[in-house]
Amino acid sequence: MNTPSQLSLPLYLPDDETFASFFPGENATLLAAIKLAINQPHGSYIYFWSRDSGGRSHLLHAACAELSLKDEAVGYVPLDKRAYFIPEVLDGMEHLSLVCIDNIESIAGDEEWEMAIFNLYNRILEIGRTCLLISGDRPPRQINLKLPDLASRLDWGQIYKLQPLSDDEKLQALQLRAKLRGFELPEDVGRFLLKRLDREMRTLFMALNQLDHASIVAQRKLTIPFVKDILHL
């Protein structure tokens, strides 16, 4: 059993992946639904999906961070990293205020894990006090699960598609993250990054973090020549 503010797994939650740093774009409805769900006294369930995993994990990290600040007990389970833990880690999670399950598609075909998630879902449903957030890379019915009952359970409740950001929205998301970190990302530099790098937000944010550190060390503002030098572009 977890005590308040502890995570069920000894995993690092990025301190810059909060609700404040999430640029919603066309996902304002999903963001509002998650904020409402995690603050309800009774149980709730939301499933959301997208091909880009970065935004999904960001929202789950943000939900965990939000409730941890209120001394609520939360659990975050990244199923793409399940090689590092066993299904029994889910035991007792039905007593937490929030359970976030990331990358549900990763367990497709793994009967032991499918049954463990199914049983946890049922326990959460029975007790009725836990908010359950699950993310995947496709709608529930398109995941090739061996356990039909789990596929049916995942299809209950609220289901959202996390809409991708446009290039202009990605630029705004990068500038927001830079502002929260205490530096400025000029528009021309941001557009250069979008043009030269993989457009997945996780890749862009990693580059932004690298540039932030390099600019502090070099005591320089971000310019295109500086970015080219640091990122070897």
Curated annotation (Swiss-Prot):
<dbReference type="InterPro" id="IPR022864">
    <property type="entry name" value="Hda_Enterobact"/>
</dbReference>
<dbReference type="InterPro" id="IPR027417">
    <property type="entry name" value="P-loop_NTPase"/>
</dbReference>
<dbReference type="Pfam" id="PF00308">
    <property type="entry name" value="Bac_DnaA"/>
</dbReference>
<dbReference type="InterPro" id="IPR055199">
    <property type="entry name" value="Hda_lid"/>
</dbReference>
<comment type="similarity">
    <text>Belongs to the DnaA family. HdA subfamily.</text>
</comment>
<dbReference type="GO" id="GO:0006270">
    <property type="term" value="P:DNA replication initiation"/>
</dbReference>
<comment type="subunit">
    <text>The active form seems to be an ADP-bound monomer. Forms the RIDA complex (regulatory inactivation of DnaA) of ATP-DnaA, ADP-Hda and the DNA-loaded beta sliding clamp (dnaN).</text>
</comment>
<protein>
    <recommendedName>
        <fullName>DnaA regulatory inactivator Hda</fullName>
    </recommendedName>
</protein>
<dbReference type="InterPro" id="IPR017788">
    <property type="entry name" value="Hda"/>
</dbReference>
<keyword id="KW-0236">DNA replication inhibitor</keyword>
<dbReference type="Pfam" id="PF22688">
    <property type="entry name" value="Hda_lid"/>
</dbReference>
<dbReference type="GO" id="GO:0032297">
    <property type="term" value="P:negative regulation of DNA-templated DNA replication initiation"/>
</dbReference>
<dbReference type="InterPro" id="IPR013317">
    <property type="entry name" value="DnaA_dom"/>
</dbReference>
<comment type="function">
    <text>Mediates the interaction of DNA replication initiator protein DnaA with DNA polymerase subunit beta sliding clamp (dnaN). Stimulates hydrolysis of ATP-DnaA to ADP-DnaA, rendering DnaA inactive for reinitiation, a process called regulatory inhibition of DnaA or RIDA.</text>
</comment>
<keyword id="KW-0235">DNA replication</keyword>
